[in-house]
Amino acid sequence: MPTETLQTGSMVKPVSPAGTFTSAVPLRILNKGPDYFRRQAEPNPKRLSAVERLEADKAKYVKSQEVINAKQEPVKPAVLAKPPVCPAAKRALGSPTLKVFGNHAKTESGVQRENLKLEILKNIINSSEGSSSGSGHKHSSRNWPPHRSEATDLHRHSFAESLKVYPTQGRSSPQEGGSHVGRRLLEQSAESFLHVSHSSSDIRKVTSVKPLKAIPCSSSAPPLPPKPKIAAIASMKSPEADPVEPACGVSRRPSLQRSKSDLSDRYFRVDADVERFFNYCGLDPEELENLGMENFARANSDIISLNFRSASMISSDCEQSQDSNSDLRNDDSANDRVPYGISAIERNARIIKWLYSIKQARESQKVSHV
């Protein structure tokens, strides 16, 4: 047997279980004591707050004895005040029957609410069906009287006024008088229908009302040209329609009409003002007097020359293509036709040139006076 194996065997020492425990567990845990392990075994150990920890170490950083003796309590969250309970609720809570059957009462109240909603829906459906069947049944199905205010009445009255169709022509034939009677009967029925309460059936009926169509007038009445005076139209109403007209405080306002002569006069004035502005270049009368009207007339003749053809060839080509047949038939009418005017670009260029010449004339006059 070799000596090396004997030496190694003698060097190996048996390891005791106490030695393994001491080597595995640190020394600082062994020095803690049994209280440390008991605290870890507790399910929810109470943790000190910051105030309590400072209170314990107060002697280290506080010098005065009064502060050391004074104890600071931790701040607690504010407790919310409960709402006051009415005495009826207290009695209900105190009664043993409600405590025992509380859940059953809750379910009963929920069922009652659902039944109430179903009854309301049934009443609405019955009222809508009754309104479609007849007005008598509709009034019997209501459980509350209709309440109308002045604002709603005024709104309905204005809506009924908007449904009315006013006559557009001055004269009216006997057939038109009959049509006016029919219109007013429809208006009266619409007004009587509108004076109802705000229920769901009424709203459905309002939405389903068709707009009243104007009854076409007879073709025997000849068309008349529009007249400038409105009073003449009001005086020529048919005498048959006046007694049937319903009494209402709102006065009718006929639409404003203008005669063709008035419109043409307005257009002519606008054209004249524009032409005068371009002819006189927007100069004041004082400047025109200083320049002299004879000089202005000579320069103005350059601007207002109507014999000069327009620079816009598109409009001239269109006019020539439209009037080509008439030119071939009548040469005299072509000579009498008014020639083309000057385009806006050409006119502006001539105005600028003319103003420049006026400026040069003024400067030359100043030099001559000096």
Swiss-Prot record:
- Sites where Phosphoserine occurs are at S238, S301
Keywords annotated in UniProt: Cytoplasm, Cytoskeleton, Phosphoprotein
Q: Where in the cell is it found?
A: Cytoplasm; Cytoplasm, Cytoskeleton, Microtubule organizing center, Centrosome
At the top level, the lineage of the source is Eukaryota
Task: Cite the InterPro entries for this sequence.
Answer: FAM110, FAM110_C, FAM110_N
Has the keyword Phosphoprotein been applied to this entry?
A: yes
* GO CC annotations on file: centrosome; cytoplasm
Report the SS bond pairs. Answer: none
Member of which family? Answer: Belongs to the FAM110 family.
UniProt-recorded name of the protein:
Protein FAM110B
Gene symbol of the encoding locus:
FAM110B
